[in-house]
UniProtKB/Swiss-Prot annotation:
The active site is at E120. Its cofactor is Zn(2+). Pathway: Amino-acid biosynthesis; L-methionine biosynthesis via salvage pathway; L-methionine from S-methyl-5-thio-alpha-D-ribose 1-phosphate: step 2/6. This is Methylthioribulose-1-phosphate dehydratase.
């Protein structure tokens, strides 16, 4: 299946042990572009992420919109339309979706946006420095993940290219980036900042 498929399985296992992708939740998609080829590898629905194998992945031709590989007995991720929207509207190279408890908790404390500034880790985000304010939009959860598409499209249309994530209230977070390496960095940095914000709230420290 290739390097992208192996990497998705490796990362899903790592994310499982971080409690980001437990109980079959969450998913990852990686895009591979080579000449005229434009292909996405997508983690399936309902598979324990720590046990996932490369042959479990769906492979889609992004130019034609057709599946090149459909694993037997598995269902496509309900996140697929959301992954595709990030590829189309942000020219992303990868998308990570987790059920991070830090994201869920922050979604209960903040209204329409999560904001934080004057924290060193913000430098990990694109075009952000120590004094800049990181803003992550928060959208409302729906019964099915594919029903989030309209809200996600609104975020992708209204927010700047420097916005690389959206929190889904009571659900988790989607993070995208130009490559899986960058996407992973953004995801880790954001989760750090979300956790820090929760601790600051616990100790009544105002967010800068």
């Amino acid at each position: 299946m290739g390097e992208a498929a192996e990497l998705i399985c490796t990362l899903c296992k790592q994310f499982y042990h971080l409690n980001w992708c437990t109980g079959t939740g969450g998913g990852i998609s990686i895009r591979e572009r080579n000449g005229e080829s434009d292909v996405a590898y997508i983690a399936p629905s309902g598979v324990q992420k720590e046990l996932m194998r490369p042959e479990d992945l769906f492979v889609m031709d992004l130019i034609k919109g057709d599946y090149l590989s459909i694993p037997r007995g598995l269902k496509p991720s309900a996140c697929t339309p959301l992954f595709l929207a990030c590829y189309k509207k942000r020219n992303s190279g990868a998308v990570i979706h987790t059920h991070s408890q830090n994201a869920v908790m922050c979604s209960l404390l903040f209204d329409k946006e999560f904001k934080i500034s004057n924290i060193e880790q913000i430098k990990a985000m694109p075009n952000h420095g120590y004094y800049d304010t990181l803003t992550i939009p928060i959208i409302e959860n729906m019964a099915h993940e594919d029903e989030l598409i309209d809200q996600l499209n609104d975020v992708l249309d209204k927010y700047s290219q420097d916005t690389v994530a959206v929190i889904v209230r009571r659900h988790g977070i989607f993070v995208w980036g130009p490559s899986i390496e960058k996407c992973k960095i953004y995801n880790e940095a954001i989760d750090y900042l979300l956790e820090l914000a929760l601790k600051m709230h616990q100790y009544n420290i105002p967010l800068p």
